[in-house]
UniProtKB/Swiss-Prot annotation:
This is EKC/KEOPS complex subunit GON7. Component of the EKC/KEOPS complex that is required for the formation of a threonylcarbamoyl group on adenosine at position 37 (t(6)A37) in tRNAs that read codons beginning with adenine. The complex is probably involved in the transfer of the threonylcarbamoyl moiety of threonylcarbamoyl-AMP (TC-AMP) to the N6 group of A37. GON7 likely plays a supporting role to the catalytic subunit KAE1 in the complex. The EKC/KEOPS complex also promotes both telomere uncapping and telomere elongation. The complex is required for efficient recruitment of transcriptional coactivators. The gene is GON7. InterPro entries: EKC/KEOPS_Gon7. It comes from Candida albicans (strain SC5314 / ATCC MYA-2876) (Yeast). It comes from the Eukaryota.
Length: 121
């Protein structure tokens, strides 16, 4: 019997948990669609030096690839939730709470660029 990873996302603002399952006809790879460097960096000639190695055709290697696919599904879902939340709050720049906007900008820069908080101040 082959075990397949799944994930469940819960949050106070959603009625029922969101379940993530892998489909049987889905190709799995350790090169995730949402875990690589940004398209902007790639177009500028950047190189992903942290790119993972390909998975081996072993039970653990296949699990590694399945987990990467599952992570992609979660990342896409969470990105969509963030976009909806941003629209719900007026788009992030439409005269809302400036401090919250600054915090979100700081978080984005840290996550996207690896900028340290001390460097920004």
């Amino acid at each position: 019997m082959k075990l397949t990873p799944t994930a469940i996302y819960t949050a106070p603002d959603i009625d029922s948990p969101k379940h993530f399952h892998l489909s049987k006809n889905e190709d799995h790879s350790t090169n995730g669609k949402t875990t690589q460097i940004s398209d902007i960096v790639i177009k500028a000639g950047g190189e992903d030096r942290d790119k993972p190695s390909d998975h081996k055709d072993t039970p653990l290697g296949n699990l590694r690839a399945e987990l990467t696919t599952l992570q992609d599904h979660l990342n896409i879902f969470l990105t969509e939730r963030m976009k909806l939340e941003k629209l719900k709050n007026g788009g992030g720049g439409g005269g809302g709470d400036n401090n919250k906007s600054n915090e979100q900008d700081l978080e984005r820069r840290i996550l996207d660029e690896g900028v340290e908080e001390e460097e920004i101040e």
